[in-house]
Amino acid sequence: MGKNYEGHLVASGLKVGIVVGRFNEFITSKLLGGAQDGLIRHGADEGDIDVAWVPGAFEIPFAAKKMAESGRYDAVITLGTVIRGSTPHFDYVCNEVAKGVSSLALTTGIPVIFGVLTTDTIEQAVERAGTKAGNKGWEAASAAIEMANLAKQFEE
C-alpha cells in the first residue's frame, strides 16, 4: 500500500507571510486578527508572522508573489474584502485577484491561500470577519498551516 499524505494543524516552526488589502480595513483588520490568532493558537511564534499591507485587493497578488518567491516563508495568506457595488468593477477585481492568487499557489512552490472575501453586502463581510459565520482569516490560517505541513512531507 502506498503512502498517505496529510497536513497537520501544527504551526510551530512555520514562517508565514500575510498580505492584507487596506481597502475596507474595518473588515480586513478583523480578518488579519483572526489569521494571526489562528496561527499563534496552533503554535506559531509571533516573530514568524510577517504582514504586508497593500492598498486594495487588486494589489494582493503582486505582494504575495514577492513574499512567496523570497524563500523566507512556508506559506502566504492573502486577505482582503471586495464588496459588490453598482458597477461591474467588483467582477473584474474579484476575478483577477482570484486568478492571480491561484496561479501563485501553482507556480511558486509554496501554498498561497485565498482569504479574500467577495460579498454582496457589508453585512455579509462583517459576518465572515468574526461574527455569525466565523472568521475567514482564521480559516485561511488553518488552511495555510495544513498545506505548509503537507508540502514539507513531499520534500522528505
Curated annotation (Swiss-Prot):
UniProt enzyme class: transferase
UniProt xrefs under Pfam families: DMRL_synthase (PF00885)
Record's GO cellular component terms: cytosol; riboflavin synthase complex
Entry EC no(s): 2.5.1.78
Example GO molecular function: 6,7-dimethyl-8-ribityllumazine synthase activity
Residues that bind (2S)-2-hydroxy-3-oxobutyl phosphate: 86-87, 128
UniProt record similarity statement: Belongs to the DMRL synthase family.
PANTHER family hit by this protein: 6,7-DIMETHYL-8-RIBITYLLUMAZINE SYNTHASE, 6,7-DIMETHYL-8-RIBITYLLUMAZINE SYNTHASE DMRL SYNTHASE LUMAZINE SYNTHASE
Function of the protein: Catalyzes the formation of 6,7-dimethyl-8-ribityllumazine by condensation of 5-amino-6-(D-ribitylamino)uracil with 3,4-dihydroxy-2-butanone 4-phosphate. This is the penultimate step in the biosynthesis of riboflavin.
Protein name (record): 6,7-dimethyl-8-ribityllumazine synthase
Organism field: Shouchella clausii (strain KSM-K16) (Alkalihalobacillus clausii)
